[in-house]
A protein has these predicted regions:
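Small-residue-rich hydrophobic transmembrane alpha-helices
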Residues: 1-45, 76-95
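Residue-level recognition of transmembrane alpha-helices
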Residues: 30, 66-69, 73, 99-100, ...
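Membrane-interface helix-loop junctions in multi-pass transport and translocation proteins
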Residues: 45, 104-138, 152
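Alpha-helical transmembrane segments of multi-pass membrane proteins
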Residues: 56-82, 109
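Intrinsic disorder in cytosolic terminal tails and internal cytosolic loops
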Residues: 150-165
């Protein structure tokens, strides 16, 4: 969220190059963070599960579930960076749409569909999360590519018109 005022300021000032630059930096930071967190969960799931339970069987079950549930966490930084940038450039509705897409439009149906496709019904429910995350990131990238280019093109045109005035 620290990038939001910087991106918003530069967008408001008409500085498209700085908006692009702040998005690239935000994307790098978010991806590094999500990949790091994903790696920690994949390498040490018992550590995380053990924070909430002490029973060995429960910790083992939760550790396995965490690995499945967080399977696509490494790509989530992309969605976070795009959502923050949408808000920063005045496209809050786009941010809401991709959030709703991930948790309601994709996840809820996948929770019901995945157990029909996989033999292990419990794992299938957990697998709905990374499936929804993966599809949501693809949707977010497509939506972001279109709207970010449109917003920056409009900004650059306004700057040209102001320069000619």
């Amino acid at each position: 969220q620290g990038a939001q005022p910087i991106t918003s300021y530069n967008f408001g000032a008409g500085n498209a190059a700085r908006v692009r630059e702040s998005f690239r930096l935000l994307l790098k930071v978010c991806v590094i963070y999500s990949v790091t967190l994903w790696a920690l969960v994949m390498l040490f799931p018992q550590l995380f599960a053990g924070m909430f339970a002490s029973d060995a069987q429960l910790v083992d079950f939760a550790a396995r579930a965490l690995r499945i549930y967080c399977g696509a966490m490494f790509i989530f930084g992309i969605q976070i960076a795009c959502q923050m940038t949408f808000v920063s450039i005045g496209y809050a509705l786009c941010s809401i749409i991709v959030a709703v897409m991930r948790k309601f439009v994709l996840l809820i149906p996948l929770i019901y569909i995945m157990p029909q496709l996989l033999a292990d019904k419990v794992s299938a429910v957990y697998a709905a999360e990374p499936a929804a995350d993966s599809l949501a990131v693809l949707f977010t990238i497509a939506m972001f590519a279109v709207n970010f280019k449109k917003a920056l093109r409009k900004l650059e045109e306004e700057q040209k018109n102001d320069a000619l005035s």
